[in-house]
């Protein structure tokens, strides 16, 4: 995998019209484009189709978490939109993950989100998950891969432990990535792009450091050069 192919640019914009100049600028420099909740809530499957027309696979980051039947139907609809990857919450349980895989079909890789990168140990304890984040992440990763998930989403702090737990097959996608010197924002468990890849990340998700850069394409090239 070329360094640039490891970068997923997040289209964190309220509309595709707002996202399009950025998406067109970075698409030649990255491997994937991510449509998240904000953009999907505004424009639905049309946002996925528009992003896909730029020639990169689309990562639809909806973090589905509901009863298995509902998630299966939602995954089927996501597949019809043209998404190549789709996220669900591993905490929804093995049956929900299995349902997502059934609904998505063979053309879409289902990724299971473990613990959000905005949560630290204190935040996890407050919702009843005592102990270090790594323990919860590894437990959820094993559950999801056992249920058929094709990949795991985890922070750079846990990616090495997840790789050791699930083996070489699943795709490991890592948000919470910030170039050296960049602001953490609302992320609690972060690392630089190079640190994440060295730890075992296959794909790094980069949002604000690209979106807010004066020259997003140049920023993407700089990240790729450091991998």
UniProtKB/Swiss-Prot annotation:
Reactions listed under catalytic activity: orotidine 5'-phosphate + H(+) = UMP + CO2
GO biological process entries: 'de novo' pyrimidine nucleobase biosynthetic process; 'de novo' UMP biosynthetic process
One Gene Ontology CC term in the entry: cytosol
Alphabetical keyword list: Decarboxylase, Lyase, Pyrimidine biosynthesis
Pfam families in UniProt: OMPdecase
Keyword Lyase: yes
Active site location: 63
UniProt-listed CDD domains: OMP_decarboxylase_like (cd04725)
Pathway recorded for this protein: Pyrimidine metabolism; UMP biosynthesis via de novo pathway; UMP from orotate: step 2/2
Record GO terms (molecular function): orotidine-5'-phosphate decarboxylase activity
InterPro entries on file: Aldolase_TIM, OMPdecase, OMPdecase_AS, OMPdecase_bac, OMPdeCOase_dom, RibuloseP-bd_barrel
Matching NCBIfam families: PRK00230.1 (NF001273), pyrF (TIGR01740)
Function recorded in the entry: Catalyzes the decarboxylation of orotidine 5'-monophosphate (OMP) to uridine 5'-monophosphate (UMP).
Oligomer and partners: Homodimer.
Protein name, UniProt field: Orotidine 5'-phosphate decarboxylase
Gene that encodes the chain: pyrF
